[in-house]
Amino acid sequence: MQKLTILGATGSIGASTLKVIEQNPDKFSVVALAADSNVEKMQQLCQRWQPEFAVMANKEAALRLKMALAVLAPNTQVLGGQEALCYVATLEQVDSVMAAIVGAAGLVPTMAAVKAGKRILLANKEALVMSGQLFIDEVEKSGAQLLPVDSEHNAIFQCLPQAVQGNLGRCDLASQGVSHILLTGSGGPFRYTDVAELEAVTPEQAIAHPNWSMGPKISVDSATMMNKGLEYIEAKWLFNANRDQLKVIIHPQSVIHSMVQYLDGSVLAQMGEPDMATPIALTLSYPERVKAGVKPLDFTQVGELTFLQPDFERYPCLALAIEACYLGQHATTTLNAANEVAVAAFLARQIKFTDIARVNDSVLNQVCKQSLASGLDSLESLLELDRMARTLADEVVRERAQ
């Protein structure tokens, strides 16, 4: 029986993880559920799963949850704050940690789980975007096992040889016959919208993703293709890929979730319904397979599969992310922070959709001019840079909002 802590239990990844566990009650059990502030949802989950621990990052929310669970789940211990997230991520009885807290907030507890040598089911791409080499080094040092949950990275993982699967972050793709990793993306809801009309896009339009069901932040990132940019950075670290080995392709149908091209001309593609339960099930059970509760792909209903080159005029955030990836750790940490601030401002109707890329570009330029590339060798230094970039992004947002 594999025992789990789920960080980000009230989000869409948390829901899909619990769906897979429900399909396989004899294989997995929930020790701890953790979230930010959604007390109502957490209350329902605790009532259903009766975990040993329930954690709310927001301490006020933790107090409200504690009162609510006194009768509904009296055996569940309720904890609050960032330290509590790290505590349940490192519990001795826990085998695996689903790292699904959105954004920079997920980095510290995910890193704590890595240092504790856990099996890390990595759904929080920002952890690698923000800490890159530091993260990979800690995985190697602690002997933690890293398994990618993101559908694209999970697809790539499945298409790679076992020698690479067991050596993420350190592998040599060329020695295993790999020529290219092809990262696919749908292009979001605006791939055919006139570029001039993007300025007027509303938050409601931006979060209506054509293929996937996701939270608001990642839905906006998919619309700008920043999500693909962050995935590009994550893929660079996970698969130790260089610029020539990593390519982004637009695939509107989201049937193929990514591909690996080999030196002999072969291309392996992983296909399936756009349902996160599939990659989650694989990370939970790897190297075995378990039921995920996902209907099989019906090829007679698939229709055509199309592929396009990304248009960087339409997706300036994707271009920024690829550029940041090769500028260094200071650039990717900065870009991630600026983007989180910009997306929140757009969702709050403070800036336009097209301002997201402008905020990101402005903050990235300001930080790169300050020569902050050195000295980012600790979690504290990265978090300090993250805070600085957010402050700069707030200033740019205020300017653009006027």
Swiss-Prot record:
It is an enzyme of class 1 (oxidoreductase). It comes from the Bacteria. It holds the Pfam family DXP_redisom_C. Mn(2+) binds at residues 150, 152, 231. 1-deoxy-D-xylulose 5-phosphate binds at residues 125, 151-152, 186, 209, 222, 227-228, 231. One of its GO terms (biological process) is isopentenyl diphosphate biosynthetic process, methylerythritol 4-phosphate pathway involved in terpenoid biosynthetic process. It catalyses: 2-C-methyl-D-erythritol 4-phosphate + NADP(+) = 1-deoxy-D-xylulose 5-phosphate + NADPH + H(+). NADPH binds at residues 10-13, 38, 124, 126, 215. Pathway: Isoprenoid biosynthesis; isopentenyl diphosphate biosynthesis via DXP pathway; isopentenyl diphosphate from 1-deoxy-D-xylulose 5-phosphate: step 1/6. InterPro entries: DXP_reductoisomerase, DXP_reductoisomerase_C, DXP_reductoisomerase_N, DXPR_C, DXPR_C_sf, NAD(P)-bd_dom_sf. Keywords: Isoprene biosynthesis, Manganese, Metal-binding, NADP, Oxidoreductase. The keyword NADP applies. Catalyzes the NADPH-dependent rearrangement and reduction of 1-deoxy-D-xylulose-5-phosphate (DXP) to 2-C-methyl-D-erythritol 4-phosphate (MEP). This is 1-deoxy-D-xylulose 5-phosphate reductoisomerase. It comes from Vibrio vulnificus (strain YJ016). The gene is dxr.
